[in-house]
Amino acid sequence: FPPGQVCCSQMHVNSGYVEDALPVVRNHVRTFMKADYDLAVAPSASCVASLGHQQPDVARSGGDEGLARDAEVVASRTLELSQLLTDVLGVTDAGAQLGSWFPHTVTYHPSCHGMRLLRLGSRQEDLLRTVADIDLRPLPDAEECCGFGGTFSLKNPDVSAHRGGEDREGCLLYT
């Protein structure tokens, strides 16, 4: 991790605190612009999506076009983990190529940001399918919101609990 790395600012922006997000974006972008790396990899599709979809806009709203351009550079060099594994490293069989083994029954719910903003497609599920001894069961309505992402569950706890309950019931039925 580069020294000085901080939050991507997504929580600030999604909560409506765009002005408060500007110094966070500035610190994040400057930290990564001066770091020596070819690619940054994050396990969170939400954070990666924030870099390309929110940080340049936050910089522009603060009147800093140079920061917006730098944010776009940082975003172009940042990948979600499954993008690194499949697109860069060419992993197509996690069991054979990575020695991944998990003798359990699981289901998979794709993240909204991965599915909608990063358009990861089936990368993550395809990788899971190749883990040795895994029993991957389909999750009905997997493309629907889980109701728990980001600050949604904090702002809308009743809706989130209801959606989460539906997802848990679906997971239990199919695994």
Where do the language-model regions lie?
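Iron-sulfur cluster-binding electron-transfer modules in prokaryotic oxidoreductases
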Residues: F1-L173
